[in-house]
Amino acid sequence: MNHAITMGIFWHLIGAASAACFYAPFKKVKHWSWETMWSVGGIVSWLILPWAISATLLPDFWAYYRSFSASTLLPVFLFGAMWGIGNINYGLTMRYLGMSMGIGIAIGITLIVGTLMTPIINGQFAVLMHTQGGQMTLLGVLVAVIGVGIVTRAGQLKERKMGIKAEEFNLKKGLLLAVMCGIFSAGMSFAMNAAKPMHDAAAALGVDPLYAALPSYVVIMGGGALVNLGFCFIRLAKVKNLSVKADFSLAKPLIISNLLLSALGGLMWYLQFFFYAWGHASIPAQYDYMSWMLHMSFYVLCGGVVGLVLKEWNNAGRRPVSVLSLGCVVIIIAANIVGLGMAS
């Protein structure tokens, strides 16, 4: 496995670790509605940071975006909006299925769809099936899905042991939402594929290859922001017990604390895709579709590790922790199989 591929896998691990931790600051926000908190974090992660970083990287910010036709930008934006719909469905999936089953089904589906649909759309899948490297990377995807399944099983054992139940369990509704979440969340992978002309144009302007994907986030995350912020703003306007005015009528120190914590959560959310771009740039072009598999499987891995570090599994007993550890090991093996496949 060469150095570039190793670093690509490493950067995806760092990005996934940030994704697994980003909600921690949000949990410390007090006396704010979820909609206000999520909107503040979202404005930072989906609007301020993509625009600020792109303005820093590009020699002429507006000229860069004006150089693309609507036929190039629109699919990128719409795939970003597609991801935004998946993001909203994610929370509803947890509500009706519980954390473990919801995450397992949603992440498993988005891992498969987001990883395999790209080479299918690009007409590369048949080639991958008949080359040693392609076969190994596809085997890695299968092993990763097995690893996610094992971690999901560990979560179910933990919830059963600790008496944790879904807020409003509904198998039929939950499964439908989980499938929708998995498919729509893959929009980020599709958006990155559609944004390749934007990445190439940024590189042609002298932007370092590690950063070449970042200017496309203005469009991708703009689509996601439209859906997420629109959802939050509509609820803030329509739901009687939600009020932005009330949220900002708290004591000034608490407002400042909530703003900073929400902004920190937004920063950590953005960093997952900042390092995703670095990992994506380090992977051989013919295997760039594997970025999504690495990100999502590492997200599950890091989520399990973070849970152990935060002592969320202390009262779960030995068996759930053992199953979780096995799942994490399987995901690590999957990443190595993919790395060897890309290097062959």
From Swiss-Prot:
Q: What's the superkingdom here?
A: Bacteria
Disulphide bridges: none
Q: Which controlled-vocabulary keywords does the entry list?
A: Cell inner membrane, Cell membrane, Membrane, Sugar transport, Symport, Transmembrane, Transmembrane helix, Transport
| Pfam families named in the record | RhaT (PF06379)
- Main localization of the protein described in the UniProt heading: membrane
Q: Where in the cell is it found?
A: Cell inner membrane
How does the protein's chain sit in the membrane according to the entry?
Multi-pass membrane protein
State the InterPro entries in the record.
L-rhamnose-proton_sym_RhaT (IPR004673)
Gene Ontology terms for molecular function = rhamnose transmembrane transporter activity; symporter activity
For this protein, the parts annotated as crossing the membrane are: 4-24, 38-58, 68-88, 101-121, 131-151, 175-195, 214-234, 259-279, 290-310, 323-343
Q: Which GO terms describe its cellular component?
A: plasma membrane
The record's catalysed reaction(s) read: L-rhamnopyranose(in) + H(+)(in) = L-rhamnopyranose(out) + H(+)(out)
- UniProt similarity note: Belongs to the L-rhamnose transporter (TC 2.A.7.6) family.
What is this protein's function? Uptake of L-rhamnose across the cytoplasmic membrane with the concomitant transport of protons into the cell (symport system).
Q: Which HAMAP family match?
A: RhaT (MF_01532)
- The entry's protein name is L-rhamnose-proton symporter
* Organism, scientific name: Klebsiella pneumoniae subsp. pneumoniae (strain ATCC 700721 / MGH 78578)
Question: What does UniProt list as this organism's lineage?
Answer: Bacteria, Pseudomonadati, Pseudomonadota, Gammaproteobacteria, Enterobacterales
